[in-house]
Curated annotation (Swiss-Prot):
One of its GO terms (molecular function) is protein domain specific binding. Gene3D superfamilies: Arfaptin homology (AH) domain/BAR domain. Residues 44-247 form the AH domain. GO terms for cellular component: acrosomal vesicle; Golgi apparatus. Residues 426-435 have a biased composition (Basic and acidic residues). Residues 391-435 are annotated as: Disordered. It comes from the Eukaryota. One of its GO terms (biological process) is spermatid development. Transmembrane segments: none annotated. Disulfide bonds: none annotated. This is Islet cell autoantigen 1-like protein.
Amino acid sequence: MDSFEHLRPEDSQSVVSRMQKKYWKTKQVFIKATGKKEDEHVVASDAELDAKLEVFHSIQETCNELVKAVEKYQLRLNVISEEENELGLFLTFQAERDATQAGKMMGAAGKALCSSAKQRLALCTPLSRLKQEVATFSQRAISDTSVTINRMERARTEYRGALLWMKDASQELDPDTFKQVEKFRKVQIQVRNSKDCFDKLKMDVCQKVDLLGASRCNMLSHSLATYQRTLLGFWEKTAQMMSQIQEACAGFHPYDFMALKQLQDTPGNLTAEDKEEQTEGSCLSTNLNKVALSEEEERFEREPAVARALPRDSLEGDDFEKEFSFLSSLLSPTSSRASECTQECQPACGSPSLMCQEPSLGPGPLTSSSQFLPSRLFDLGLHADGAFNSWASQEGSEHSDTLPVPSQHPKKLKYLGPLSNPDAIGHSDDELLNA
Protein backbone atom coordinates (compact mmCIF):
# COMPACT_ATOMS: atom_id res chain seq x y z
CA MET A 1 0.00 0.00 0.00
CA ASP A 2 2.87 2.37 0.74
CA SER A 3 4.17 1.95 -2.78
CA PHE A 4 0.85 3.27 -4.15
CA GLU A 5 0.62 6.19 -1.71
CA HIS A 6 3.85 7.83 -2.82
CA LEU A 7 4.73 8.54 -6.50
CA ARG A 8 8.15 7.72 -7.76
CA PRO A 9 10.43 10.68 -8.65
CA GLU A 10 10.55 9.62 -12.30
CA ASP A 11 6.75 9.68 -12.58
CA SER A 12 6.53 13.01 -10.77
CA GLN A 13 9.18 14.48 -13.07
CA SER A 14 7.35 13.34 -16.21
CA VAL A 15 4.12 14.99 -15.10
CA VAL A 16 5.91 18.24 -14.43
CA SER A 17 7.63 18.05 -17.80
CA ARG A 18 4.32 17.60 -19.61
CA MET A 19 2.81 20.54 -17.79
CA GLN A 20 5.76 22.74 -18.64
CA LYS A 21 5.57 21.64 -22.27
CA LYS A 22 1.87 22.58 -22.45
CA TYR A 23 2.61 25.92 -20.82
CA TRP A 24 5.26 26.99 -23.34
CA LYS A 25 3.21 25.75 -26.25
CA THR A 26 0.24 27.82 -25.09
CA LYS A 27 2.50 30.84 -24.71
CA GLN A 28 3.68 30.45 -28.30
CA VAL A 29 0.08 30.24 -29.52
CA PHE A 30 -0.71 33.43 -27.61
CA ILE A 31 2.27 35.24 -29.13
CA LYS A 32 1.22 34.20 -32.64
CA ALA A 33 -2.41 35.19 -32.06
CA THR A 34 -1.56 38.62 -30.67
CA GLY A 35 0.97 39.29 -33.43
CA LYS A 36 3.88 39.99 -31.16
CA LYS A 37 7.33 40.09 -32.66
CA GLU A 38 9.16 36.77 -32.57
CA ASP A 39 12.83 35.99 -32.84
CA GLU A 40 13.98 37.14 -36.28
CA HIS A 41 16.42 34.25 -36.71
CA VAL A 42 13.71 31.69 -36.07
CA VAL A 43 11.38 33.43 -38.54
CA ALA A 44 14.11 33.65 -41.19
CA SER A 45 14.75 29.90 -40.95
CA ASP A 46 11.15 29.26 -42.10
CA ALA A 47 11.22 31.64 -45.11
CA GLU A 48 11.12 28.81 -47.66
CA LEU A 49 8.20 27.20 -45.90
CA ASP A 50 6.26 30.48 -45.81
CA ALA A 51 6.76 30.91 -49.57
CA LYS A 52 5.37 27.43 -50.20
CA LEU A 53 2.37 28.23 -48.01
CA GLU A 54 1.63 31.36 -50.07
CA VAL A 55 1.70 29.28 -53.24
CA PHE A 56 -0.70 26.79 -51.69
CA HIS A 57 -3.19 29.48 -50.64
CA SER A 58 -3.03 30.97 -54.14
CA ILE A 59 -3.76 27.58 -55.73
CA GLN A 60 -6.66 27.02 -53.35
CA GLU A 61 -8.28 30.41 -54.03
CA THR A 62 -7.81 30.30 -57.80
CA CYS A 63 -9.32 26.82 -58.06
CA ASN A 64 -12.42 27.93 -56.18
CA GLU A 65 -12.76 31.03 -58.37
CA LEU A 66 -12.23 28.93 -61.50
CA VAL A 67 -15.13 26.64 -60.58
CA LYS A 68 -17.43 29.65 -60.08
CA ALA A 69 -16.28 31.26 -63.34
CA VAL A 70 -16.93 28.07 -65.32
CA GLU A 71 -20.46 27.86 -63.89
CA LYS A 72 -21.23 31.45 -64.89
CA TYR A 73 -19.68 30.89 -68.31
CA GLN A 74 -21.93 27.91 -68.96
CA LEU A 75 -25.01 29.93 -68.01
CA ARG A 76 -23.99 32.78 -70.35
CA LEU A 77 -23.38 30.35 -73.21
CA ASN A 78 -26.85 28.88 -72.81
CA VAL A 79 -28.44 32.33 -72.77
CA ILE A 80 -26.59 33.63 -75.82
CA SER A 81 -27.29 30.42 -77.75
CA GLU A 82 -31.02 30.76 -77.04
CA GLU A 83 -31.05 34.40 -78.13
CA GLU A 84 -29.09 33.64 -81.28
CA ASN A 85 -31.40 30.76 -82.17
CA GLU A 86 -34.50 32.93 -81.67
CA LEU A 87 -33.03 35.64 -83.90
CA GLY A 88 -32.26 33.08 -86.61
CA LEU A 89 -35.79 31.67 -86.47
CA PHE A 90 -37.25 35.18 -86.69
CA LEU A 91 -35.18 36.03 -89.77
CA THR A 92 -36.10 32.72 -91.40
CA PHE A 93 -39.81 33.34 -90.76
CA GLN A 94 -39.62 36.84 -92.23
CA ALA A 95 -37.69 35.56 -95.25
CA GLU A 96 -40.54 33.18 -96.10
CA ARG A 97 -42.91 36.15 -96.36
CA ASP A 98 -40.53 38.32 -98.41
CA ALA A 99 -39.73 37.32 -102.00
CA THR A 100 -37.24 40.13 -102.65
CA GLN A 101 -33.48 40.11 -102.39
CA ALA A 102 -33.79 41.25 -98.79
CA GLY A 103 -35.76 38.10 -98.04
CA LYS A 104 -32.97 35.96 -99.46
CA MET A 105 -30.42 37.75 -97.31
CA MET A 106 -32.54 37.32 -94.18
CA GLY A 107 -33.07 33.64 -94.92
CA ALA A 108 -29.36 32.95 -95.33
CA ALA A 109 -28.46 34.94 -92.22
CA GLY A 110 -31.18 33.19 -90.19
CA LYS A 111 -29.93 29.73 -91.12
CA ALA A 112 -26.36 30.74 -90.28
CA LEU A 113 -27.41 32.04 -86.86
CA CYS A 114 -29.33 28.86 -86.03
CA SER A 115 -26.34 26.73 -87.01
CA SER A 116 -24.00 28.95 -84.98
CA ALA A 117 -26.24 28.61 -81.91
CA LYS A 118 -26.14 24.81 -82.10
CA GLN A 119 -22.37 24.75 -82.54
CA ARG A 120 -21.92 27.16 -79.64
CA LEU A 121 -23.63 24.70 -77.29
CA ALA A 122 -20.85 22.21 -78.10
CA LEU A 123 -18.56 24.33 -75.92
CA CYS A 124 -20.47 23.24 -72.83
CA THR A 125 -19.02 19.69 -73.00
CA PRO A 126 -15.32 20.61 -72.46
CA LEU A 127 -16.38 23.23 -69.92
CA SER A 128 -18.31 20.64 -67.92
CA ARG A 129 -15.29 18.35 -67.98
CA LEU A 130 -13.02 21.19 -66.85
CA LYS A 131 -15.36 22.06 -64.00
CA GLN A 132 -15.51 18.44 -62.86
CA GLU A 133 -11.74 18.01 -62.91
CA VAL A 134 -11.12 21.25 -61.01
CA ALA A 135 -13.71 20.29 -58.39
CA THR A 136 -12.10 16.85 -57.96
CA PHE A 137 -8.67 18.46 -57.71
CA SER A 138 -9.94 20.80 -54.97
CA GLN A 139 -11.67 18.05 -53.02
CA ARG A 140 -8.76 15.59 -53.04
CA ALA A 141 -5.35 17.09 -53.71
CA ILE A 142 -5.90 20.46 -52.07
CA SER A 143 -7.72 18.93 -49.08
CA ASP A 144 -4.90 16.42 -48.49
CA THR A 145 -2.26 19.12 -48.65
CA SER A 146 -4.31 21.28 -46.28
CA VAL A 147 -4.37 18.46 -43.70
CA THR A 148 -0.59 18.10 -43.91
CA ILE A 149 -0.16 21.85 -43.51
CA ASN A 150 -2.30 21.87 -40.38
CA ARG A 151 -0.16 19.12 -38.84
CA MET A 152 2.97 21.04 -39.75
CA GLU A 153 1.61 24.22 -38.12
CA ARG A 154 0.99 22.35 -34.87
CA ALA A 155 4.53 20.90 -34.98
CA ARG A 156 6.00 24.34 -35.63
CA THR A 157 4.09 25.83 -32.72
CA GLU A 158 5.36 23.06 -30.46
CA TYR A 159 8.91 23.51 -31.69
CA ARG A 160 8.90 27.26 -31.16
CA GLY A 161 7.40 26.77 -27.71
CA ALA A 162 10.23 24.37 -26.88
CA LEU A 163 12.71 27.01 -28.01
CA LEU A 164 11.14 29.52 -25.62
CA TRP A 165 11.35 26.96 -22.84
CA MET A 166 15.04 26.27 -23.57
CA LYS A 167 15.73 30.01 -23.66
CA ASP A 168 14.19 30.40 -20.23
CA ALA A 169 16.10 27.40 -18.86
CA SER A 170 19.40 28.69 -20.21
CA GLN A 171 19.08 31.86 -18.14
CA GLU A 172 19.16 29.83 -14.90
CA LEU A 173 21.95 27.54 -16.07
CA ASP A 174 25.31 27.66 -14.27
CA PRO A 175 27.74 25.07 -15.67
CA ASP A 176 30.42 25.75 -13.02
CA THR A 177 28.17 24.70 -10.16
CA PHE A 178 26.21 22.23 -12.27
CA LYS A 179 23.08 24.13 -11.32
CA GLN A 180 20.02 23.41 -13.50
CA VAL A 181 22.19 21.37 -15.86
CA GLU A 182 19.94 18.36 -15.67
CA LYS A 183 16.86 20.46 -16.34
CA PHE A 184 18.50 22.10 -19.35
CA ARG A 185 19.41 18.71 -20.80
CA LYS A 186 15.79 17.54 -20.56
CA VAL A 187 14.59 20.72 -22.28
CA GLN A 188 17.24 20.32 -24.95
CA ILE A 189 16.05 16.77 -25.63
CA GLN A 190 12.47 18.06 -25.96
CA VAL A 191 13.58 20.72 -28.44
CA ARG A 192 15.48 18.17 -30.52
CA ASN A 193 12.47 15.83 -30.71
CA SER A 194 10.05 18.60 -31.69
CA LYS A 195 12.50 19.87 -34.31
CA ASP A 196 12.77 16.43 -35.91
CA CYS A 197 8.97 16.16 -36.15
CA PHE A 198 8.69 19.70 -37.54
CA ASP A 199 11.42 19.17 -40.15
CA LYS A 200 9.75 16.01 -41.37
CA LEU A 201 6.36 17.70 -41.78
CA LYS A 202 8.02 20.74 -43.30
CA MET A 203 9.57 18.58 -46.00
CA ASP A 204 6.23 16.90 -46.66
CA VAL A 205 4.48 20.24 -47.06
CA CYS A 206 7.08 21.60 -49.49
CA GLN A 207 6.94 18.45 -51.61
CA LYS A 208 3.14 18.36 -51.65
CA VAL A 209 2.86 22.03 -52.63
CA ASP A 210 5.29 21.52 -55.51
CA LEU A 211 3.41 18.43 -56.62
CA LEU A 212 0.11 20.29 -56.26
CA GLY A 213 1.24 23.09 -58.58
CA ALA A 214 2.56 20.66 -61.18
CA SER A 215 -0.59 18.54 -61.12
CA ARG A 216 -2.76 21.63 -61.53
CA CYS A 217 -0.80 22.76 -64.59
CA ASN A 218 -1.06 19.27 -66.06
CA MET A 219 -4.82 19.15 -65.45
CA LEU A 220 -5.47 22.59 -66.96
CA SER A 221 -3.30 21.89 -70.00
CA HIS A 222 -5.32 18.80 -70.90
CA SER A 223 -8.75 20.27 -70.12
CA LEU A 224 -8.17 23.65 -71.74
CA ALA A 225 -6.62 22.05 -74.83
CA THR A 226 -9.92 20.28 -75.52
CA TYR A 227 -11.85 23.49 -74.96
CA GLN A 228 -9.47 25.44 -77.20
CA ARG A 229 -9.85 22.98 -80.09
CA THR A 230 -13.65 23.09 -79.79
CA LEU A 231 -13.68 26.89 -79.66
CA LEU A 232 -11.41 27.28 -82.70
CA GLY A 233 -13.53 24.83 -84.70
CA PHE A 234 -16.67 26.75 -83.80
CA TRP A 235 -15.27 30.11 -84.90
CA GLU A 236 -13.82 28.70 -88.12
CA LYS A 237 -17.17 27.24 -89.17
CA THR A 238 -19.04 30.40 -88.21
CA ALA A 239 -16.60 32.66 -90.07
CA GLN A 240 -16.82 30.45 -93.16
CA MET A 241 -20.64 30.61 -93.19
CA MET A 242 -20.68 34.38 -92.75
CA SER A 243 -18.11 34.83 -95.52
CA GLN A 244 -20.21 32.76 -97.92
CA ILE A 245 -23.29 34.85 -97.10
CA GLN A 246 -21.35 38.06 -97.70
CA GLU A 247 -20.08 36.84 -101.07
CA ALA A 248 -23.56 35.70 -102.12
CA CYS A 249 -25.12 39.06 -101.22
CA ALA A 250 -22.37 41.20 -102.74
CA GLY A 251 -24.26 41.74 -106.02
CA PHE A 252 -27.57 42.76 -104.45
CA HIS A 253 -28.92 46.23 -105.19
CA PRO A 254 -28.46 48.56 -102.20
CA TYR A 255 -31.48 50.22 -100.64
CA ASP A 256 -31.73 54.01 -100.55
CA PHE A 257 -33.72 54.99 -97.47
CA MET A 258 -34.77 58.56 -98.25
CA ALA A 259 -36.32 58.98 -94.79
CA LEU A 260 -32.86 58.67 -93.21
CA LYS A 261 -30.88 60.88 -95.58
CA GLN A 262 -30.39 63.49 -92.85
CA LEU A 263 -28.92 60.95 -90.42
CA GLN A 264 -26.52 59.25 -92.83
CA ASP A 265 -25.11 60.00 -96.25
CA THR A 266 -26.75 58.57 -99.37
CA PRO A 267 -24.86 55.49 -100.64
CA GLY A 268 -22.31 56.44 -103.25
CA ASN A 269 -23.04 53.51 -105.55
CA LEU A 270 -26.44 54.73 -106.75
CA THR A 271 -27.25 54.10 -110.39
CA ALA A 272 -27.78 56.81 -113.00
CA GLU A 273 -31.51 56.06 -113.21
CA ASP A 274 -31.97 56.74 -109.48
CA LYS A 275 -30.18 60.08 -109.80
CA GLU A 276 -32.35 61.07 -112.79
CA GLU A 277 -35.51 60.17 -110.86
CA GLN A 278 -34.41 62.33 -107.93
CA THR A 279 -33.67 65.28 -110.29
CA GLU A 280 -37.04 64.96 -112.05
CA GLY A 281 -38.86 64.80 -108.72
CA SER A 282 -37.20 67.99 -107.47
CA CYS A 283 -37.99 69.84 -110.75
CA LEU A 284 -41.61 68.71 -110.65
CA SER A 285 -42.07 69.94 -107.08
CA THR A 286 -40.54 73.32 -108.03
CA ASN A 287 -42.91 73.72 -111.03
CA LEU A 288 -45.94 72.83 -108.92
CA ASN A 289 -44.99 75.48 -106.38
CA LYS A 290 -44.65 78.11 -109.13
CA VAL A 291 -48.07 77.23 -110.62
CA ALA A 292 -49.73 77.42 -107.21
CA LEU A 293 -48.20 80.85 -106.55
CA SER A 294 -49.30 82.23 -109.96
CA GLU A 295 -52.88 81.05 -109.42
CA GLU A 296 -53.01 82.76 -106.03
CA GLU A 297 -51.71 86.03 -107.52
CA GLU A 298 -54.34 86.00 -110.32
CA ARG A 299 -57.16 85.31 -107.87
CA PHE A 300 -55.92 88.12 -105.66
CA GLU A 301 -55.95 90.59 -108.59
CA ARG A 302 -59.51 89.61 -109.64
CA GLU A 303 -60.94 90.32 -106.17
CA PRO A 304 -62.32 93.87 -105.59
CA ALA A 305 -60.50 96.21 -103.29
CA VAL A 306 -63.30 96.33 -100.69
CA ALA A 307 -63.60 92.55 -100.53
CA ARG A 308 -59.87 92.22 -99.98
CA ALA A 309 -59.90 94.87 -97.29
CA LEU A 310 -62.73 93.35 -95.27
CA PRO A 311 -62.56 89.87 -93.79
CA ARG A 312 -65.14 87.50 -95.24
CA ASP A 313 -66.31 86.16 -91.95
CA SER A 314 -67.24 89.66 -90.71
CA LEU A 315 -69.55 90.44 -93.70
CA GLU A 316 -71.73 87.36 -93.84
CA GLY A 317 -73.38 84.75 -91.68
CA ASP A 318 -74.61 84.85 -88.14
CA ASP A 319 -71.22 86.04 -86.84
CA PHE A 320 -71.90 89.58 -88.07
CA GLU A 321 -75.23 89.75 -86.29
CA LYS A 322 -73.72 88.37 -83.06
CA GLU A 323 -70.83 90.82 -83.05
CA PHE A 324 -73.02 93.90 -83.68
CA SER A 325 -76.04 92.90 -81.58
CA PHE A 326 -75.04 95.53 -78.99
CA LEU A 327 -76.05 98.29 -81.48
CA SER A 328 -79.72 97.34 -81.24
CA SER A 329 -80.05 99.31 -78.00
CA LEU A 330 -78.64 102.40 -79.69
CA LEU A 331 -80.85 102.14 -82.77
CA SER A 332 -84.10 101.15 -81.01
CA PRO A 333 -85.37 104.74 -80.14
CA THR A 334 -85.30 105.82 -83.78
CA SER A 335 -86.42 102.61 -85.41
CA SER A 336 -89.97 103.86 -86.13
CA ARG A 337 -88.77 107.16 -87.61
CA ALA A 338 -86.14 105.39 -89.67
CA SER A 339 -88.83 103.19 -91.19
CA GLU A 340 -90.95 106.28 -92.05
CA CYS A 341 -88.02 107.99 -93.69
CA THR A 342 -87.26 104.87 -95.63
CA GLN A 343 -90.83 104.72 -96.98
CA GLU A 344 -90.71 108.39 -98.01
CA CYS A 345 -87.32 108.06 -99.67
CA GLN A 346 -88.14 105.00 -101.71
CA PRO A 347 -90.34 106.73 -104.35
CA ALA A 348 -88.04 109.72 -104.45
CA CYS A 349 -84.72 107.96 -104.72
CA GLY A 350 -85.91 105.00 -106.73
CA SER A 351 -83.36 102.65 -105.18
CA PRO A 352 -84.56 101.06 -101.96
CA SER A 353 -81.58 98.78 -101.83
CA LEU A 354 -79.23 101.71 -101.35
CA MET A 355 -81.03 102.90 -98.23
CA CYS A 356 -80.79 99.47 -96.77
CA GLN A 357 -77.09 99.31 -97.40
CA GLU A 358 -75.17 98.43 -94.29
CA PRO A 359 -72.88 101.15 -93.02
CA SER A 360 -70.36 98.49 -92.28
CA LEU A 361 -69.12 98.58 -95.89
CA GLY A 362 -66.50 101.11 -94.98
CA PRO A 363 -62.95 101.32 -96.03
CA GLY A 364 -61.58 99.66 -92.91
CA PRO A 365 -62.06 96.04 -91.86
CA LEU A 366 -64.34 95.27 -88.91
CA THR A 367 -62.96 93.31 -86.03
CA SER A 368 -64.50 91.65 -83.01
CA SER A 369 -66.85 93.48 -80.63
CA SER A 370 -64.08 94.02 -78.13
CA GLN A 371 -62.19 96.17 -80.68
CA PHE A 372 -65.27 98.21 -81.92
CA LEU A 373 -64.63 101.72 -80.45
CA PRO A 374 -66.61 105.01 -80.72
CA SER A 375 -63.98 106.38 -83.08
CA ARG A 376 -64.88 103.63 -85.53
CA LEU A 377 -68.56 104.64 -85.27
CA PHE A 378 -67.63 108.16 -86.28
CA ASP A 379 -65.66 106.97 -89.32
CA LEU A 380 -68.52 104.75 -90.43
CA GLY A 381 -71.00 107.63 -90.17
CA LEU A 382 -68.86 109.90 -92.30
CA HIS A 383 -68.52 107.21 -94.91
CA ALA A 384 -72.29 106.72 -95.06
CA ASP A 385 -72.92 110.47 -95.57
CA GLY A 386 -70.31 110.68 -98.28
CA ALA A 387 -71.72 107.68 -100.11
CA PHE A 388 -75.25 109.11 -100.00
CA ASN A 389 -74.17 112.58 -101.24
CA SER A 390 -72.23 111.12 -104.17
CA TRP A 391 -75.18 108.96 -105.17
CA ALA A 392 -77.64 111.88 -104.85
CA SER A 393 -75.52 114.16 -107.04
CA GLN A 394 -75.17 111.48 -109.71
CA GLU A 395 -78.90 110.71 -109.79
CA GLY A 396 -79.79 114.41 -109.85
CA SER A 397 -77.73 115.03 -112.96
CA GLU A 398 -79.27 112.11 -114.82
CA HIS A 399 -82.95 112.54 -113.78
CA SER A 400 -83.19 116.28 -113.09
CA ASP A 401 -86.17 116.67 -115.45
CA THR A 402 -88.38 113.97 -114.04
CA LEU A 403 -87.70 113.79 -110.29
CA PRO A 404 -88.30 116.68 -107.86
CA VAL A 405 -85.57 117.53 -105.42
CA PRO A 406 -86.65 116.48 -101.93
CA SER A 407 -86.23 119.35 -99.52
CA GLN A 408 -86.72 117.52 -96.21
CA HIS A 409 -85.03 114.25 -97.07
CA PRO A 410 -81.52 115.08 -95.78
CA LYS A 411 -82.92 115.91 -92.35
CA LYS A 412 -85.01 112.78 -92.24
CA LEU A 413 -82.12 110.63 -93.35
CA LYS A 414 -80.26 111.74 -90.28
CA TYR A 415 -82.73 109.79 -88.18
CA LEU A 416 -81.91 106.50 -89.80
CA GLY A 417 -79.43 106.02 -87.02
CA PRO A 418 -76.70 107.76 -85.07
CA LEU A 419 -74.14 106.27 -87.43
CA SER A 420 -75.19 108.60 -90.31
CA ASN A 421 -75.08 111.75 -88.12
CA PRO A 422 -72.16 111.96 -85.69
CA ASP A 423 -73.60 115.18 -84.15
CA ALA A 424 -76.68 113.27 -82.96
CA ILE A 425 -74.68 111.26 -80.49
CA GLY A 426 -75.53 112.52 -77.00
CA HIS A 427 -78.64 114.64 -78.05
CA SER A 428 -82.36 113.91 -77.76
CA ASP A 429 -84.85 113.71 -80.63
CA ASP A 430 -86.43 117.16 -79.90
CA GLU A 431 -83.06 118.85 -80.00
CA LEU A 432 -82.31 117.22 -83.33
CA LEU A 433 -85.70 118.38 -84.82
CA ASN A 434 -85.16 121.96 -83.63
CA ALA A 435 -81.71 121.93 -85.08
